[in-house]
Amino acid sequence: MYKRYFSTSLKTNQQALKKILEEKTYQVTTYARPSDLCITRGLNAKLFDDFNNKEYIDFTAGIAVTALGHANPKVAEILQTQATKLVHSSNLYFTKECLDLSEKLIEKTKKFGGQHDASKVFLCNSGTEANEAALKFAKKHGITKNPKKQGIIAFENSFHGRTMGALSVTWNKKYRTPFGDLVPHVSFLNINDELSKIKDFINTKKDEIAGLIIEPIQGEGGIFPIPIEKLVALKEICQKNDIIVIYDEIQCGLGRTGNLWAHAALPKAAHPDIFTSAKALGNGFPIAATVVNEKVNNALQVGDHGTTYGGNPLGCAVSNYVLDVIGDQAFLDSVTKKGELLKKGLLKIKEQHPDKISDVRGSGLIWGVEFKDAPGAIVQKARELGLLVITAGKTTVRFVPSLTIEDEVVEEGLTIFNKAVNDVFSK
């Protein structure tokens, strides 16, 4: 609809954009967005603003979504082809695309070292929906054992979504407080506490706890990988007390770490009872999945949960392709290789500013650079120079580019980020 604003004059286009964003905005005020930027198209790891005739290297990938790049031609072809066949028929009936995707999720997960007892899949539309399903399934399992077994353990610095259940297990009070009372019986623990303290809490409350939800790599909290020994110990104590373990892999899963799932790097003893996926699963098309083992599935009955759009043929067709591409060892190896390139560049920048940068952490193509002060000015300067990055937590800049990003684009983006850091710190 905005084509009518484009002209051969850059000034005219910029004036048109200002009019759109300042005078013609019909969206609620829930987002803080720059008023001088409007994305009009993308190509793999780059985005373009045709209003301002600007090109950006994108190290955000739509917040770890477009794993196979913007405007992926094969994804576009699949969407177009499937749209001419069947878009939606609801979960009243089976569809081939849904059946294929469910099988592929289970088989690929097992093949690439993920949840060894993965059994069934619930398909929905977004990460928060996938986590809602996981929480409901855990509570249902708990209640079948003991009517009082309804509580959920979550962790400080967690982020699991913005719908009421997922919001209830999200740590940051700025997201929770404005909405009053949320889902009860949620306890937040500190993953950095001694294991003995965490175990004591669980042992004391074991008859009241249905599930535990955790991100193997905390994303919004600042890109913090959870130590393997902590995840092993958590699963052990939870299994002993019949508590369902949920891994939120919405941001860190699907090849992001160089493994198909972040938990694929863990021993089987630390595998979850449930894990969730979204974001990259549709490469930008809304689709998500909640994967459960047989123990969880046995607690469920027809009608316990549902969704109108979840598992629609359009989304499933795309996701089948995404899994085919990412669920390939050569592709995963390429992510690891690109991740090493990104890591090397970020560590070099840290070495130049030891008094300003306190840490570089992550794996594959999910990295966080922690500054000693809030990095908002650096993010803004990077954008001015042609690089899009985002924050995670209060002091960390997050790097989650498309998994298909070219090596030379990684290098170019690092050069821009280095200049942004130098420009800000030289003031």
Swiss-Prot record:
Localization terms from the record: Mitochondrion matrix
Modified residues (N6-(pyridoxal phosphate)lysine): 279
Enzyme Commission designation: 2.6.1.11
Protein name: Acetylornithine aminotransferase, mitochondrial
GO cellular component: mitochondrial matrix
GO MF, any single term: N2-acetyl-L-ornithine:2-oxoglutarate 5-aminotransferase activity
Gene that this sequence comes from: ARG8
One Pfam family per UniProt: Aminotran_3
Top EC class of this enzyme: transferase
Alphabetical list of CDD domains matching this protein: OAT_like
Cofactor: pyridoxal 5'-phosphate
Pathway recorded for this protein: Amino-acid biosynthesis; L-arginine biosynthesis; N(2)-acetyl-L-ornithine from L-glutamate: step 4/4
Keyword annotations of the record: Amino-acid biosynthesis, Aminotransferase, Arginine biosynthesis, Mitochondrion, Pyridoxal phosphate, Transferase, Transit peptide
Taxonomic lineage from the root: Eukaryota, Fungi, Dikarya, Ascomycota, Saccharomycotina
Catalytic activity: N(2)-acetyl-L-ornithine + 2-oxoglutarate = N-acetyl-L-glutamate 5-semialdehyde + L-glutamate
Chief location category: mitochondrion
Top-level taxon of origin: Eukaryota
Family: Belongs to the class-III pyridoxal-phosphate-dependent aminotransferase family.
Record carries keyword Amino-acid biosynthesis: yes
GO terms, biological process: arginine biosynthetic process via ornithine; L-arginine biosynthetic process
